[in-house]
Amino acid sequence: MDHDDALVGRLLTRREAVRLMGVAGAAGLFGSNLLAAQDRTTTCVVRPELIEGPYFLDASSNRSDIRVDASSGKARDGVPLIVTLGVAQVTAGQCSPLPKALVHMWQCDAVGVYSGVSDPQIGSGNPQDNALRGTQQTDTSGIARFTTIYPGWYRGRAVHIHFKIRTEASGQAYEYTSQLFFPETLTDEIHARAPYAQHGRRDTMNERDMIYREAGEQLLLRPTKTSSGYEAPLSLALDLSDAAVGRSDAEGMRGRGGRGRGGRGRGGL
């Protein structure tokens, strides 16, 4: 189903965003490098919030390469992936890069395990383990870049990465939380390799994932192959005047997220 022209809450649609700033402005907002692998008309789209889930840790290290566990010095095995987020702000009908925003990113490893949590099914059990978790501050162009691995899977969820953006650019604390998803064909190809293959075939495709079905197509990455792995850019805009979106996830007991309300489900969120 094509959600390009469907409203999600107060979100701008792709068509509205293009009218807002014009195609030329959309192409130039973050520069051609970020947008080379994606549709340039999506630059100023306000994308949906989705649920935070139970595995966010607020003590993530400030670093770009999040593959290494700082406590052991060991890197998580997996196909290298560079995720580049271009963050903009919508103010008075104009879209501009948002500098100095704090971007958190966290995900499971190639066999579906989250670092730093004690969940017996998908947690590493070591509270000092911080692999595949980290934060970056957006630069003057609104860019934050993470070097990670293509994520694995765990029961009940499609393959995904969590991220959170915090800023006080509007004069008060603003927090946006969502998730990134991946094309099925690429996931099948990568998960057939080691170390992913040892975990078996995933049990939940995108269209069967309760979070993806809410708005996942608007947060679907389009990774492109590089000499060492893959890279995946995504641009998104924040409406800092939207207090409902900008309130802390802690206020909603980590169950808030656009229309993504709900409990932990079969295997965490």
Predicted region positions:
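Low-complexity, intrinsically disordered Gly/Pro/Thr-rich segments
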Residues: 213-224
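Extracellular interaction modules
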Residues: 226-231
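Beta-strand-dominated extracellular/periplasmic modules and repeats
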Residues: 40-215, 233, 237-254, 268
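Boundary at the C-terminal end of the N-terminal hydrophobic targeting segment
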Residues: 36-37
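Long, low-complexity intrinsically disordered regions enriched in Ser/Thr, Asp/Glu, Pro/Gly
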Residues: 256-269
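Alpha-helical and His/Cys-centered functional microenvironments
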Residues: 20-23, 164-166
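N-terminal secretory signal peptides
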Residues: 1-16, 23-30
